[in-house]
Amino acid sequence: MDVGYEQFLAPELFFNPEILNPEYTTPLANLVDQTIMHCPVDTRRGLYSNIVVAGGSTKFKGFDKRLQRDLNRLVKSRYEANIKAVKEKLAGNVEVQGKQMEVCVNGSKKREIASWLGGSYVASQVYVDRMD
């Protein structure tokens, strides 16, 4: 079997889902970003700096780097927009400084079974009731 561009199409669906279906228009990076932005403000920096990818589909070559790059673009864009808005509000008379979020995406070598390992660990803990 000869596989051409199709080999690149599968992982691209995570980043451009509209390729498969026009109804799916939110890329994975945007979903991760939206999820973190719904968390309490004081936890966001820690969440952005410790994003862990799991599952067999994340083993595509460059997946974690691509996700990190796309998230960095979103975070940087929002940071610059916020700085600009603050400067405009203060009439540009004040130097505005802020610390941009650090985005770090990691994946273990055994990420295809990481979800199972995590679930198995939690289930083995004494405090987990069988009815939970």
What are these regions (language model features)?
Residues 1-132:
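C-terminal region/appendage detector
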